[in-house]
Design a protein with these regions (language model features):
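Generic beta-sheet signal
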Residues: 34, 60-63, 163, 191
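Short glycine-centered, acidic/aromatic-flanked micro-motifs in structured strand/loop junctions
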Residues: 35, 108-112, 135-137, 164-165
Length: 363
């Protein structure tokens, strides 16, 4: 919650002690059920009520799912707990409340002649943890415009995993990717190779220094044979998970700041709400601005608080998804424009390059 810069009371924590007083069935809810291998299973009456209400439940077990989780939750997809999973569990909760986007996108930036084998290893590891991973050799279909698609995928990622090898900045394309990350203000997790200095390369950078002992047989300088040890790979995956919220919040901050600055220049009176959307009232009609990171999707305006505001007075409420269109592929921008012209409800996207024009001319 702190990383997302949301008010502390945005989520109300309920347990068996305050359940009867605090739980309301028609409010959004998410349940974490902690497993117990000693038995008997606890709080089954609460579980049955939550299932009846259609509440999402995440079973968390410690050793054996079949022994620790009650029959009522055996159909649920659980997660095994350890200290490395804390960020993952927290993010699952935030995603369920639509406070953090559910697509977990990572872009791997590396120099092919120095770290191909590690790049592929991290691609496979992140995919196995259900990340949507971009790796240039694996993620672009034949016949696509390579560089255009690469920038497009970077724009839509949550975080960049940069394999900072000694020759990384000697590559023209690696430097281009780094510059692009800076212009888009995307946070970077740096894996810094042994005997290599950290470069101050981003406004939002999270370095992780690697030692030769982190590599299998201490081989770290062979592009085809170097492999990280399994425990280090797991540490990196969890590190990437832990910085997602901070990175997305930072990008959202920048988008809000830029939009508010232009709005002030145009004499508009716009308010930033604690839930991090913006509102404005003009001639008795409310406009809700939803800051969107990456490529706008329909679910960006389906969050519970946005739906609540819209449903109070749909006839006099407009929704605008504001987003940075830099490097989004033209075919996607045309699709979004087509949706703007064909949607029946007053819900449209508003691209960054048109902020000023729209704020100056729309009343």
């Amino acid at each position: 919650i702190i990383d997302l810069k949301l008010p502390q009371d945005v989520i109300n924590i309920i347990d068996r002690n305050n359940w009867k007083d605090e739980y309301v069935g028609n409010q959004p809810a998410f349940c974490i059920y902690l497993g117990n291998d000693n038995g008997p299973f606890e709080d089954l009456a609460i579980v049955e009520k939550l299932i009846k209400d259609g509440t999402m439940i995440l079973p968390v077990f410690f050793n054996d799912f079949s022994k620790e989780i009650p029959e009522e939750l055996k159909k649920q997809n659980g997660i095994k707990y350890d200290d490395n999973q804390q960020s993952r569990i927290a993010n699952i909760v935030l995603q369920a409340f639509e406070l953090l986007r559910s697509t977990r996108k990572v872009f791997i930036s590396y120099k092919r002649s120095e770290s191909t084998s590690v790049a592929i290893q991290m691609y496979e590891a992140l995919e196995s943890h259900h990340f949507d991973v971009f790796l240039d050799t694996h993620s672009i279909e034949k016949g696509e415009l390579f560089q255009e698609e690469l920038w497009h995928r970077m724009t839509d990622c949550d975080v960049i995993l940069l394999l900072n090898t000694p020759g990384f900045l000697e590559s023209h394309w690696c430097k281009e990717e780094l510059a692009e990350a800076g212009s888009k203000q995307i946070g970077i997790v740096q894996l810094v190779w042994p005997n290599h200095k950290i470069n101050a390369i981003s406004h939002l950078s999270f370095p992780l220094n690697l030692e030769s002992t982190d590599f299998v047989n201490t081989i770290y300088d062979d592009k085809d044979k170097s492999k990280l040890k399994n425990n280090k790979v797991e540490e990196i995956v969890q590190f990437v998970e832990s910085v997602r919220a901070r990175n997305l919040a930072s990008r959202q901050d920048n988008l809000i700041t830029e939009f508010m600055s232009i709005a002030k220049q145009c004499g508009r009176d716009i308010t930033v709400q604690p839930e991090r959307y913006l509102t404005e009232v003009i001639s008795g009609k409310k406009i809700i601005y939803v800051p969107t990171i990456g490529i706008p999707q329909s679910f960006n305006c389906q969050a519970a608080d946005i739906r609540y505001e819209y449903d109070k007075n749909p006839q006099n409420t407009r929704i605008r998804l504001i987003y940075d269109d830099l490097r989004i592929r033209d075919k996607w921008l045309k699709h979004l424009d087509w949706l703007n012209n064909n949607l029946k409800k007053d819900i449209f996207t508003l691209k960054k390059q048109e902020f000023k024009k729209w704020l100056e001319t729309t009343k």
